[in-house]
């Protein structure tokens, strides 16, 4: 599960997503690349721990990540 406390920057957020979701080495570390990777292989469900911490660090980018996950059909739970 992604840990929002580790997402202190956009780069750190994409590192965390890559680690947790097992994204490929060519993952471009942005919202479009995340959407592309989720088309090929997506988890059924993700629990995003400490979403509030990510939101404080990332602002609207945290909501953007959540939107991409949900648009890809991932059942997202924020905690």
Name each region found by the language model.
Residues 1-79:
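Positively charged, polar, low-complexity stretches
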């Amino acid at each position: 599960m992604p840990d929002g406390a580790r997402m202190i920057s956009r780069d750190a957020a994409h590192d965390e997503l890559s680690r947790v979701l097992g994204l490929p080495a060519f993952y471009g570390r942005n919202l479009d690349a995340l959407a592309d990777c989720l088309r090929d292989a997506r988890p059924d469900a993700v629990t995003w721990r400490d979403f509030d911490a990510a939101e404080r660090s990332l602002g609207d980018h945290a909501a953007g990540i959540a939107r991409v996950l949900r648009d890809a059909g991932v059942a997202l739970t924020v905690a």
